[in-house]
C-alpha cells in the first residue's frame, strides 16, 4: 500500500458522515455520557474504565520495518519490527471497521510547545472519552491555526477492533504500530488511553534528535529569575512531588525537548497518577480534576459520585488527564530557557547512594544511560528484597534510536550551557529497605533547594570511594551525617559490601552499551 493510498483512506474516513471533528470539551462530555462510555464525578470530571488493559502493553508495540528507517531504529524487545505487509493489511481492516461506526471523533492539534519544532497531529477515535483525553493531553490549536492545520502524524485508534495474531503478525489481540513512512500510528485491542500519549512521545523521540533536539522523559520548572530545572526519575522517585514547587512555575510534568532555544513541553496537559491522591499531599493535582478532566480506572461511589483514590480494585495505575491551564503556577506557552540545573532522582532501596551528589559531564551521561532506581519485590513470608531496576535514559520503553545518541546529545548540551547535574537519592538511609528508613522529604527538599540556588556550587565535597561521586559535606537544613550514607549505617562493613554489590550491578547493566565511549565508562561509573 502506497503512502498515497493511505492518505486516500484517511481522507475518506475524515470526510465520512460519521466523523465528528474538533468537538468542544462540553460536547465531548455530553457524548461520553450519552454513549455510556463513562460517568460524571462529583467534581465534574469524566471517569472511564479501560477494561483488561490498565497500563501500557509493551509486548504489543511495533515499528513498521520500512527502508527509510530500518538502519536508524534500535531494534529489539522495545522496538519490535513488523512487516509493511502486515501493517497494510491491518490498517485496511481497521479503516473498514471504523467506517461502519455510527460516530467517530477527530482531534487536530500539536505536539511541541515551541512553534519552530511542533508536530501537527490528528487523532481519530472510536471512543468519545479517548478524544476528550487527547484534547486535554496534547496542544490545542487556536481557530486560526485550525484553518491551516495539516497533520504530520495521525493516530487511528480502534480499541474494540481485535487483531488475530495468527493472521496479523501481532503477539495478542492488542497492537500499537508506528509507520514512520506513512506517518500513522495504528492502535487496537486496548482501551488504555496512555498508549496514544506515549506513541506520540516515541515519535518525537525519533523526529526531534534528527533536528538536533534532545527529547527527554522528565518534568521541568522555572524560577522567578528564569532559571530552569529538569527532573528525571522513574516511577516512585518523587519526580511529581519535588518538581511541584510553590516558588517555581511548572513548564511540564513528563515530556520535553531541549533545542538551541531552550526547553519546551511536548504536551499541552498532564497525565498524573492518582493512587492515594489527597488534597493535603498533592493539592495541584487534586484541584485539577474538574469539568473536562478525565479519570482513568478510578473507583467512583455510585451514589455520591465521589472518587475513591485509595481504592485500587481495578489497578494501582489510576490516572487523571487534564490540560496545563487546569493548574496554577504554570508557564504558558510551555517554553523556557536552557536548564541551569538537572536533577536525576533515584529511590535506592539498598540505602548506599548518597542523598545528593554532584556529577561531572561523564558521570551525568553514565547515570543518564543507567536510569537506576529500585523496585521492591513481593513480601511473601515476610521477606522483602529490593530489586535494582535500570531504565535507559529514564525512559527506555519510548526510545526508538540507540541510547548513546540521546546520551551524547545530553553531554554536549550540559557542556555548552554549563548545566549543573546532581544525583538525588530519595530512597533509604541508615540501612537497606527493612532496616533503614526512607529519606526525610524535608531534607530532600532542602538539598534540591541548595542545588537550584547555586549554593552547592561553592560547597566543599568529598569523593565517594566506591561510586566516585562528589558528595557535599554541608547542606543548609540537613544534618552533616545524613550526607555521607556510610555514617548512617550502624554496620560499616555491611554498608561497604552492599555498596560494592550495587556498583557491580551498575557495571553489569552497562555492558549492553557497546557503542558508548570509554570515557563515559572510565570517568562516569563506579571506581571500586
Curated annotation (Swiss-Prot):
<feature type="binding site">
    <location>
        <begin position="233"/>
        <end position="241"/>
    </location>
    <ligand>
        <name>ATP</name>
    </ligand>
</feature>
<dbReference type="InterPro" id="IPR001272">
    <property type="entry name" value="PEP_carboxykinase_ATP"/>
</dbReference>
<comment type="function">
    <text>Involved in the gluconeogenesis. Catalyzes the conversion of oxaloacetate (OAA) to phosphoenolpyruvate (PEP) through direct phosphoryl transfer between the nucleoside triphosphate and OAA.</text>
</comment>
<feature type="binding site">
    <location>
        <position position="198"/>
    </location>
    <ligand>
        <name>ATP</name>
    </ligand>
</feature>
<feature type="binding site">
    <location>
        <position position="198"/>
    </location>
    <ligand>
        <name>Mn(2+)</name>
    </ligand>
</feature>
<keyword id="KW-0456">Lyase</keyword>
<dbReference type="InterPro" id="IPR008210">
    <property type="entry name" value="PEP_carboxykinase_N"/>
</dbReference>
<dbReference type="GO" id="GO:0046872">
    <property type="term" value="F:metal ion binding"/>
</dbReference>
<dbReference type="GO" id="GO:0006094">
    <property type="term" value="P:gluconeogenesis"/>
</dbReference>
<feature type="binding site">
    <location>
        <position position="56"/>
    </location>
    <ligand>
        <name>substrate</name>
    </ligand>
</feature>
<feature type="binding site">
    <location>
        <position position="217"/>
    </location>
    <ligand>
        <name>Mn(2+)</name>
    </ligand>
</feature>
<keyword id="KW-0464">Manganese</keyword>
<comment type="similarity">
    <text>Belongs to the phosphoenolpyruvate carboxykinase (ATP) family.</text>
</comment>
<feature type="binding site">
    <location>
        <position position="192"/>
    </location>
    <ligand>
        <name>substrate</name>
    </ligand>
</feature>
<keyword id="KW-0210">Decarboxylase</keyword>
<keyword id="KW-0312">Gluconeogenesis</keyword>
<dbReference type="InterPro" id="IPR015994">
    <property type="entry name" value="PEPCK_ATP_CS"/>
</dbReference>
<feature type="binding site">
    <location>
        <position position="319"/>
    </location>
    <ligand>
        <name>substrate</name>
    </ligand>
</feature>
<feature type="binding site">
    <location>
        <position position="282"/>
    </location>
    <ligand>
        <name>ATP</name>
    </ligand>
</feature>
<feature type="binding site">
    <location>
        <position position="319"/>
    </location>
    <ligand>
        <name>ATP</name>
    </ligand>
</feature>
<dbReference type="GO" id="GO:0004612">
    <property type="term" value="F:phosphoenolpyruvate carboxykinase (ATP) activity"/>
</dbReference>
<keyword id="KW-0067">ATP-binding</keyword>
<dbReference type="InterPro" id="IPR013035">
    <property type="entry name" value="PEP_carboxykinase_C"/>
</dbReference>
<dbReference type="Pfam" id="PF01293">
    <property type="entry name" value="PEPCK_ATP"/>
</dbReference>
<keyword id="KW-0547">Nucleotide-binding</keyword>
<dbReference type="GO" id="GO:0005829">
    <property type="term" value="C:cytosol"/>
</dbReference>
<comment type="pathway">
    <text>Carbohydrate biosynthesis; gluconeogenesis.</text>
</comment>
<feature type="binding site">
    <location>
        <position position="198"/>
    </location>
    <ligand>
        <name>substrate</name>
    </ligand>
</feature>
<protein>
    <recommendedName>
        <fullName>Phosphoenolpyruvate carboxykinase (ATP)</fullName>
        <ecNumber>4.1.1.49</ecNumber>
    </recommendedName>
</protein>
<feature type="binding site">
    <location>
        <position position="444"/>
    </location>
    <ligand>
        <name>ATP</name>
    </ligand>
</feature>
<dbReference type="GO" id="GO:0005524">
    <property type="term" value="F:ATP binding"/>
</dbReference>
<feature type="binding site">
    <location>
        <position position="254"/>
    </location>
    <ligand>
        <name>Mn(2+)</name>
    </ligand>
</feature>
<feature type="binding site">
    <location>
        <position position="217"/>
    </location>
    <ligand>
        <name>ATP</name>
    </ligand>
</feature>
<keyword id="KW-0963">Cytoplasm</keyword>
<keyword id="KW-0479">Metal-binding</keyword>
Amino acid at each position: 500500500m502506497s503512502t498515497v493510498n493511505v492518505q486516500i483512506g484517511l481522507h475518506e474516513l475524515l470526510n465520512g458522515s460519521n466523523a465528528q471533528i474538533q468537538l468542544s470539551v462540553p460536547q465531548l462530555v455530553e457524548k461520553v455520557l450519552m454513549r455510556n462510555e463513562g460517568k460524571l464525578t462529583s467534581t465534574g470530571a469524566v471517569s472511564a474504565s479501560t477494561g483488561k488493559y490498565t497500563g501500557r502493553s509493551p509486548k504489543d508495540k511495533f515499528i513498521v520495518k520500512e527502508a527509510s528507517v530500518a538502519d536508524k531504529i534500535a531494534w529489539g524487545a522495545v522496538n519490535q519490527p513488523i512487516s509493511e505487509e502486515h501493517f497494510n493489511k491491518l490498517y485496511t481492516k481497521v479503516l473498514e471497521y471504523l467506517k461502519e461506526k455510527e460516530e467517530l471523533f477527530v482531534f487536530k492539534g500539536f505536539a511541541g510547545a515551541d512553534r519552530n519544532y511542533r508536530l501537527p497531529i490528528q487523532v481519530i477515535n472510536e471512543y468519545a472519552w479517548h478524544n476528550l483525553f487527547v484534547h486535554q493531553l496534547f496542544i490545542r490549536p487556536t481557530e486560526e491555526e485550525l484553518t491551516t492545520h495539516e497533520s504530520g502524524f495521525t493516530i487511528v485508534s480502534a480499541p474494540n477492533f481485535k487483531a488475530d495474531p495468527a493472521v496479523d503478525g501481532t503477539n495478542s489481540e492488542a497492537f500499537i504500530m508506528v509507520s514512520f513512512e506513512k506517518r500513522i500510528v495504528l492502535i487496537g485491542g486496548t482501551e488504555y488511553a496512555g498508549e496514544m500519549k506515549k506513541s506520540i512521545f516515541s515519535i518525537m523521540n525519533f523526529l526531534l534528535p534528527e533536528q538536533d533536539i534532545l527529547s527527554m522523559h522528565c518534568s521541568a520548572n522555572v524560577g522567578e529569575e528564569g532559571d530552569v530545572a529538569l527532573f528525571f526519575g522513574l516511577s516512585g522517585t518523587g519526580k511529581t512531588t519535588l518538581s511541584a514547587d510553590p516558588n517555581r512555575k511548572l513548564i511540564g510534568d513528563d515530556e520535553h525537548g531541549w533545542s538551541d532555544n531552550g526547553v519546551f513541553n511536548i504536551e499541552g496537559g498532564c497525565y498524573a497518577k492518582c493512587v492515594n491522591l489527597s488534597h493535603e499531599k498533592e493539592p495541584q493535582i487534586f484541584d485539577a480534576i474538574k469539568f473536562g478532566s478525565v479519570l482513568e480506572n478510578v473507583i467512583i461511589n455510585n451514589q455520591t459520585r465521589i472518587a475513591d483514590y485509595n481504592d485500587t480494585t481495578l489497578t494501582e495505575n489510576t490516572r487523571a488527564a487534564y490540560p496545563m491551564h487546569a493548574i496554577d503556577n504554570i508557564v504558558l506557552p510551555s517554553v523556557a530557557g536552557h536548564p541551569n540545573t538537572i536533577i536525576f532522582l533515584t529511590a535506592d532501596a539498598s540505602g548506599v547512594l548518597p542523598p545528593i551528589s554532584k556529577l561531572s559531564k561523564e558521570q551525568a551521561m553514565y547515570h543518564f544511560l543507567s536510569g537506576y532506581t529500585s523496585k521492591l519485590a513481593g513480601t511473601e513470608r515476610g521477606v522483602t528484597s529490593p530489586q535494582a531496576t535500570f531504565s535507559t535514559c529514564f525512559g527506555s520503553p519510548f526510545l526508538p534510536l540507540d541510547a548513546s545518541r540521546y546520551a551524547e546529545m545530553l553531554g554536549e548540551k550540559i557542556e555548552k550551557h554549563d548545566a549543573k547535574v546532581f544525583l538525588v537519592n530519595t530512597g533509604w538511609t541508615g540501612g537497606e529497605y527493612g532496616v533503614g528508613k526512607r529519606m526525610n522529604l524535608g531534607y530532600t527538599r532542602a538539598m534540591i533547594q541548595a542545588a537550584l540556588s547555586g549554593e552547592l556550587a561553592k560547597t566543599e565535597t568529598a569523593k565517594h570511594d566506591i561510586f566516585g561521586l562528589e558528595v557535599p559535606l554541608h547542606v543548609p537544613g540537613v544534618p552533616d551525617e545524613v550526607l555521607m550514607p556510610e555514617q548512617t549505617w550502624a554496620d560499616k562493613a555491611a554498608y561497604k559490601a552492599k555498596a560494592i554489590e550495587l556498583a557491580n550491578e551498575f557495571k553489569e547493566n552497562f555492558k549492553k552499551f557497546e557503542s558508548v565511549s570509554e570515557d563515559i565508562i572510565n570517568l562516569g561509573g563506579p571506581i571500586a
